[in-house]
Regions:
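Non-catalytic DNA-binding core/recognition domains of DNA-processing enzymes
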Residues: 1-63, 244-248, 275-278
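Flexible interdomain linker/hinge and immediately adjacent N-terminus
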Residues: 53-109
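Amphipathic alpha-helical scaffolding segments
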Residues: 58-61, 142-151, 253-254
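Basic, Lys/Arg- and aromatic-enriched nucleic-acid-binding interface segment
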Residues: 94-139
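Conserved tyrosine-mediated DNA breakage-rejoining catalytic core shared by Y-recombinases
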Residues: 143-192
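Active-site/catalytic core of tyrosine-dependent DNA strand-transfer enzymes
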Residues: 183-246, 250, 255
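C-terminal catalytic core of tyrosine-transesterase DNA break-rejoin enzymes
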Residues: 245-277
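Eukaryote-biased recognition of C-terminal alpha-helical segments
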Residues: 285-287
Length: 289
């Protein structure tokens, strides 16, 4: 068991041997190592504030890991895990098409009653179509279905379904996501073709949530969503792909013609050396109209 401040088994002496701890976490993701070391430093500062040598030891290791991670980010290099599971955007679309072919083969769209297997296949298709359209994190778990804006409590994520004589309009409402404090509430209109598919899914879904567990009794949790995504891609392409990797894949495709971070830094450095201004000042000096 690793560091758990809630456990009675842990006390400050647990971390008296830094090398042992470093060795214990060395094979974990750099981000995981960094987070664990940060937690230890915070813990030691509270529990053993006078042991500067011990705290500095962990702090230096934390800074070293942070530096390695920053270098990888600046180099825009895939991690080993990403390299093993990376797929192209076209391969992502191929998986979606393969699932749809299976849906057609089983005539699922013509059925009036779906067993759990058929429902799961249809849900997988709608889920991937949603993530192709909206490359979010695990924010599509626990999405509640509402029919009026008045039901939006400003806290949860919702699928707003509006149906009238002129047709149906659906909206994805995001109130709860990682960077909501920066970007605020987001309301996304959903494409009409996708609306038709969601309506079919909801015909067989009598709950108040968009995506359900296999038994169709409870909504997907964040962990359920991760496991489901992993199963889908392992089945159709033999790789472990989740929402985080899909975001990397899609934004890499979207920005594939942009200069790299390193190229931008090199240009900025040359301009700074030439004009003896910061990059910010050089951008302000630059006139485009």
């Amino acid at each position: 068991m690793f560091f758990d401040p809630k456990s009675d088994m842990n006390d400050a002496s647990t971390f008296d041997n830094p090398e042992k701890i470093f060795n214990l976490i060395k094979d974990q993701l750099l981000t995981t190592q960094k987070n664990r070391l940060t937690a230890i430093v915070v813990y030691l500062r509270a529990m053993k504030p006078d042991d500067r040598k011990l705290i500095d030891n962990y702090s230096k290791q934390m800074d070293s890991i942070s530096g390695k991670y920053a270098n990888i980010q600046n180099d825009q290099e895939k991690t080993a895990k990403q390299k093993d599971n990376w797929i192209t955007l076209d391969e992502f679309k191929d998986v979606i098409e393969e699932i749809f072919d299976e849906i057609q083969k089983n005539e699922i769209l013509k059925k009036k009653v779906l067993n759990n297997r058929d429902y799961s296949l249809l849900q997988s298709y709608v889920l991937l179509r949603m993530y192709l359209e909206f490359p979010l994190r695990n924010d599509l778990c626990n999405v509640k279905i509402i029919k009026s804006k008045l039901d939006d409590n400003g806290t949860d994520n919702f699928l707003l379904t509006r149906t009238n004589k002129t047709g149906s309009k659906f909206f994805l409402i995001l109130n709860n996501y990682k960077t909501v404090k920066i970007y605020g509430k987001k309301i996304y209109p959903i494409d009409n073709k996708l609306v038709k598919l969601i309506k079919i899914l909801l015909f067989f879904n009598k709950s108040s949530y968009l995506f359900l567990r296999y038994n169709r009794e409870k909504s997907l949790s964040s962990n359920d969503l991760t496991k489901l995504m992993n199963r889908i891609f392992e089945k159709y392409i033999g790789k472990t792909v989740g929402t985080s990797l899909l975001r990397h894949i899609q934004i890499s495709e979207y920005k594939k013609n942009d200069p790299t971070i390193k190229q931008i830094q090199e240009v900025n450095q040359k301009v700074e050396d030439k004009f003896l201004h910061s990059s910010k000042m050089n951008n302000e000096y630059r006139k485009i109209k």
